[in-house]
């Protein structure tokens, strides 16, 4: 067991002083292509694709087949340039730097026609000394090289041996050799996304001028004294001292609400200097801890750090201080070989519930603050507490992590390496070293981040031999793997952040991987670490096909996004499941067939003679299939948290693949591009509920487990009802004796042979009846109402076509949908087209004549607009 104790401080800002000035170069720049035939203005931060679109030179890059039509943009070499006048007297400053927070990706930088440096890493922050070349009036140029061409050159130059994979599968329509360039890996395509290898200045760029000294980095390391039961804090400040003499002064650290104020004397010698301060927080002060969503508050404390230095130089930093501990528990389990794999936050075992995050857009300048908040609010609204930031995308922007801190979303943070082997030549390692060191400094202050992971699936790719490497050559690649992730990235993490755990890969066997010299024979073992699991052939309603693993960090099924989302980027001839557009948009080999196959196991496929109706019905059915499959699998993981069966179990995490979409296409996402909730996301709101009854069958016996994520025990009852498909009145019901549901456990609450249940309920057969159940106390509902199908819906007897009507009214900012049905209706789907917002529930089984559902609009709308856009579908409508 490894103990990681954490006190975190999120930087909020800094005061400017008389001894330093900053001048932003954000805004309008000039852009031209390689041969100078195309010149246009472009915004910074931004990229070439966005600039071309904003000038009307290209359409929306996501429209129809434009990912192929605009491939030329990524293959050209573009130049960004700007002329500007600095609004202060430059000669008064001892040091002037050009700061680039993010350059995408390969460029040569000229300042006043002097080459000052190069960039080759999208994830690094670059600082160039321009003291000797800067003037009052200046010019700057970034001459980009196509990342696609650069990657090909780097691969060609690596002559000693191949570093696979060379190219993505043809179905992805992507570019090759992405593993040779430190750029967003999915920008060369993925099985859910397009190929748009962008070029541009994608983050802030500015001039910094200073005298005496400058504070470059300001980071924090926590120390918790268990014996004294008190918090301490190490503050690490990195200075660039340009004074020729030592700089003395004092530092005042203040956290008012913790009644903490301490003063330190410091002296800085010329050059790059690090100051470490040790702050003690009295154990007599009650410190409120930061908790994940659903487990407590996200309490933070304001802190100021004031440096009062010689020469009248004052530098002030403000920060938000969060207190929490994180432990990754890997220890023996009675009755099972291997080790546990779960997290304790503030000493309490937490079941991680959530999903995997991918970039929200191929063009990061389109990812607004509003979109980030919308997507992350949807995470907690669905009762999730965790996101895994997947290693094939980007280290997200600061605001993403700030929102996760605020909302209580734990972050599993991958380093940006995915589904590939990587070179380990010195130039590549040097670039990675700078990247990782910078990202650790930037992100370590966030309480939301609970673990670093070295890569996505690269250990599995190597050991399961995805790339058909010969047995004799394998040691070369194992050596490279250990060099990159263990000897470099791991060492950087251990040196830069001792406050949270690190694992080399996902999936991995954790401590067992370490014992096996960093590469396990089976990284997907059910007895160690985490697993990734995908199976599109086995029946997803059969829980026995799922791994009873310690932690499921990836699993899922595809579906199509709603018609209103696809309509924006398609034309009328595209609106069929077998159209050229539908095949083009599917980047997962065989994906469309897999969806229909899985749906056909339990549902009748759409039978309309109208092609457009069939397309819409098929979209609906893929979302039903996806939601039901992921529900079955997630509920299996949740009910496995407290038990060992056949030596397997104690599952303590379920992160389905994937949360969000990068464009409008079929994928594993539960949120469509732009944020609209698929049926799966509504299901997640229920299957991730803090209290949940889970029903399943084993050997013709029906079981209901109670699952609790709560910290306390609660007294309650379980109600079980059986309906026939042909009646809105239950044919029988049963309420258990009152029992105590223990916090943080999953236990069996109900057990009955299916034959006995059917006999007890009169005329029921498997095909004619359905079971629903819920937890309550004193007539108060404590859980969602869950259900269990006794047979496939395609075999249902008595299921009638339901006539469902809705009366819409408004209450403040919320709209009320009063529904009425003529018959039992499975998978009732309420849709208001492109009107942004979400319902309180959706995709539900309607077994009562009336039901009230709320609609929460994300933008102003009206009752009339909703009535015009509203459409309701249930399962029998597609037959």
From Swiss-Prot:
One annotated GO biological process: oligosaccharide catabolic process
Glycosylation sites: 28, 35, 77, 280, 284, 297, 302, 763
Tissues showing expression: Ubiquitous. Detected in pancreas, kidney and placenta, ands at lower levels in liver, lung, brain, heart and muscle.
Keyword Signal among UniProt keywords: yes
Keyword Hydrolase included in the entry's annotation: yes
GO molecular function, one term: beta-mannosidase activity
Annotated InterPro entries: Beta-gal/glucu_dom_sf, Beta-mannosidase-like_N2, Beta-mannosidase_GH2, Beta-mannosidase_Ig, Galactose-bd-like_sf, Glyco_hydro_2_cat, Glycoside_hydrolase_SF, Ig-like_fold
Domain of life: Eukaryota
Pathway linked to the protein: Glycan metabolism; N-glycan degradation
Result for mutant: residue 641 to H: No effect on enzyme activity (in vitro). Decreased protein stability
EC number: 3.2.1.25
GO cellular component terms listed in the entry, alphabetical order: azurophil granule membrane; intracellular membrane-bounded organelle; lysosomal lumen; plasma membrane
First-level EC class: hydrolase
Residues reported in the UniProt entry to bind substrate: 190-192, 456
Residues forming the catalytic site: 457, 554
Pfam families recorded: Glyco_hydro_2_C, Glyco_hydro_2_N2, Ig_mannosidase, Mannosidase_ig
Record disease entry: Mannosidosis, beta A, lysosomal: An autosomal recessive lysosomal storage disease of glycoprotein catabolism. Clinical features are heterogeneous with a wide range of symptoms and age of onset. The disease is associated with a range of neurological involvement, including various degrees of intellectual disability in most of the cases, hearing loss and speech impairment, hypotonia, epilepsy and peripheral neuropathy. Affected individuals have a profound reduction in beta A mannosidase activity in plasma, fibroblasts and leukocytes.
Protein name listed in UniProt: Beta-mannosidase
Source organism of the structure: Homo sapiens (Human)
